[in-house]
Amino acid sequence: MRTNLNPLFGCLVAVLLTTVTFGCKGKASGNVNTTDTVATAKPVGPSFNADSAYAFTAAQCAFGPRVMNSAAHDKCGKWIVEKFKQYGCEVKEQTADLKGYDGTVLKSTNIIARFNPQAKRRILICAHWDSRPWADNDPDSTNHKKPVMAANDGASGVAVMLELARQLQADKKLTVGVDFVCFDAEDWGVPTWATGYQNSEDSWALGAQYYAKNFPTAVKPQFGILLDMVGGEGAQFYREGMSVQLAPDVVSRVWEAAKSAGYGSYFPDNIGGMVTDDHVPVNQYAGIPTVDIIPYYLDCQQSSFGPTWHTVNDTMEHIDKNTLQAVGQTVIQVLYSL
């Protein structure tokens, strides 16, 4: 994803980036408390298991970078499908040949896993599952054409969804339905070293654009939550600007749920930058109010998305179970508060 938006989506860009030194080492501004005041927390629903989510993240990385049109990508996709089926979901694969910024035909598969498929009231939980083909934000320019492992930027969001599906199957108490959607072809956007391409923002979130324009199910979810880079060290999740503009009520719902679950320190009320991400076409084309849970590293010069974003360092060594726990438990809080 990128931090500026194309007029295709009819939105004004407002990017908030603060540059200091590249000494953030995966930490957001200040120290993130791993627990909030117990007296004010009122958690509901089952307990999210961060160890399990961590293992799901590692399992995806074990295939290697899940770059479009690669064997690792295809093998991991089959694994994701089987895991969702194992946890009682009805799974559909939405396939399409999509065109990358450079004309490359991308064999895309959106994985749609429906928990409690008979339920009419449904919630969308989504993340992308492909890896960035180029580490074009790496401090070392010799790495710019190497693929990204995408432990955080890809695998972590899918891992949280898999653990949520596992918990929902075991708990058997949630009455609403959940559509878990793994978007493909999110990270084939124009690399920084490529020149001469117009409308570069359109080259991102291709799978989500296809999903939103070719909606695959009869019942649309009431609202949606996008999980993007939800396992990074020291992450905090500011209220993303496009989410505030397009789905303010859902933003309030999610950030209040974080406080109730005991993880408000990970979800400050500050507003971050406006991000071109999968939630934008879902809002604009599918009409589903959807918010983006995405980190905002205030004092990291390398990127406001954190020091590993689109680098060869986006590996398991920088995945934090505490961050996975905060996000996973917050989503459970949202679902069980309906």
Name each region found by the language model:
Residues 19-23:
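C-terminal motif of bacterial Sec signal peptides marking the signal peptidase cleavage site
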Residues 25-28:
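Bacterial signal peptide processing site
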Residues 30-76, 87, 301-318:
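N-terminal capping segment at the start of a domain
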Residues 39-47, 62-71, 98-101, 143-155, ...:
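Second-shell loop/turn segments in exported
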Residues 50-56, 63, 87, 103, ...:
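Catalytic-core environment of secreted peptidases
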Residues 58-59, 65-118:
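A non-catalytic alpha/beta surface segment that caps or lines the substrate-entry region
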Residues 95, 105, 223, 232-338:
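Active-site-adjacent substrate-binding region
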Residues 145-249, 274, 278:
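Acidic/histidine-rich catalytic neighborhood of metal-dependent amide-processing enzymes
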